[in-house]
Structures are given as C-alpha cells and as structure tokens.
Amino acid sequence: MPKMKSHSGASKRFKVSGKGKLLRQQANRRHLLEHKPSRRTRRLDGTEVVAAADVRRVKKLLGR
C-alpha cells in the first residue's frame, strides 16, 4: 500500500506545535491594510490555536 499524502493546501496553512496543538494564521491581514486600523492589524498578528471543532478534520488532512 502506498504512503498516504498529506493535503498540500492544509500543510501550508497549519503548523503543529511542540506539544501537538494545531496553529494557524489569522485572516484579514494580507492586503487592503491601509483602511484598517492599526489596532486591528496588531490584533491579527501572530498565530491562533485551531478551534476544537475543527481539530479532527485538520489532523486528518495533515495525515496525523
């Protein structure tokens, strides 16, 4: 049986932390930033933990 392939789109979007948590970037920080408040762009900085309802599905896509 060949190896399972991980979903390449999901592998670019999600990272697994050292403790096994799934991390993702926040949306709305790619473009059209000049009309968004600085407070909002700072708040959207950094990573966020994937919601508990989505963890099972994302792990399946990543082959974990």
Swiss-Prot record:
Residue span of region Disordered: 1-41
GO biological process: translation
Superkingdom field: Bacteria
NCBIfam families (UniProt xref): rpmI_bact (TIGR00001)
Native species: Nocardia farcinica (strain IFM 10152)
Gene name as annotated: rpmI
Signal peptide: none
Lineage: Bacteria, Bacillati, Actinomycetota, Actinomycetes, Mycobacteriales
GO molecular function terms attached to this record: structural constituent of ribosome
Protein name: Large ribosomal subunit protein bL35
GO CC annotations, alphabetized: cytosolic large ribosomal subunit
Matching InterPro entries: Ribosomal_bL35 (IPR001706), Ribosomal_bL35-like (IPR021137), Ribosomal_bL35_CS (IPR018265), Ribosomal_bL35_sf (IPR037229)
Keywords for this protein: Ribonucleoprotein, Ribosomal protein
SUPFAM superfamilies from the UniProt entry: L35p-like
Keyword field contains Acetylation: no
Family: Belongs to the bacterial ribosomal protein bL35 family.
